[in-house]
């Protein structure tokens, strides 16, 4: 799937939309194309949405497969799948470009230019670096603000995310806890809680 999520912040809805990943010249660069909604986080004003559903603004671009959005105060965070690695946690800022498909910490699939690596440094290509890139991939999924019991336990602001596998060749599911600095703009540390192959709630 393309991946998508949404959050509400003030008078606006922020909606993330993924990018088709088949390597075709027709769709390859949609995340960088300002005339396309694919690979974007868009900003929609709630009060005018019914009358003008297509009246939205591109908030950020260069996204591959966003899986979740959340916020701490006025800061917006996104997690997304990379290709064969390079899953990302991003701090989303207006007008920023996160680089897909021109940079990634993942690797091309074999049908995609013989499995060659992407340009990895986002900053060197004038794109926004992820707050954290997960290599190898953990299949990161939804993300949310940590519940108060975890914030109290760690004595830090934190985000909690699910992953489909823990890696070392993918055994088991896990929970990732991203501990943030005081300004919520850098990762202080990460804790992984292994859940195993069977997850019961």
Please state what every model-predicted region is.
Residues 1-9:
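Asp-box/WD-like beta-propeller blade repeats and closely related beta-sheet repeat scaffolds
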Residues 10-11, 73:
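Residue-level signal for tight coil/turn positions that link beta-strands
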